[in-house]
A protein has these predicted regions:
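Active-site-flanking beta-strand signature of metal-NTP-handling nucleotidyl enzymes
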Residues: 3-8
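Residues that cap or initiate secondary-structure elements
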Residues: 12-14, 58-60, 96
């Protein structure tokens, strides 16, 4: 089992907008083998940090999901999200 953590640094004051987009898109982007998807915001981390976290049985599941085109609904939900972020990174952990 792996934990995938996508960490976004949003533009000042735009974290809530990215959270709204992600919460709308997450149910549309689920795939078999994915579980425990959630969106979190910083409390004591760098300001305007949004984290999208999910668990997958294996990394192939995750990368296959990213290789397939998004549904029109998911694409619409995330439309313009790059205008909200300054950058970010991905962390992948093996759950022991």
């Amino acid at each position: 089992m792996f934990l995938i953590r996508d960490i976004f640094n949003t533009k000042p004051g735009r974290a809530k907008d990215l959270v709204a987009k992600m919460k709308k898109a997450l149910p549309l982007m689920r795939a078999p083998g994915m579980q425990n998807a959630r969106v979190m915001t910083d409390t004591v981390a760098g300001y305007w940090t949004v984290v999208c976290e999910t668990e997958v049985e294996d990394l192939k599941t995750y990368f296959d999901m990213g290789a397939r085109p998004p549904s029109p609904e998911a694409e619409e939900a995330m439309k313009g999200y790059m205008d909200l972020v300054n950058g970010g990174r991905r962390e992948i952990f093996r759950i022991e």
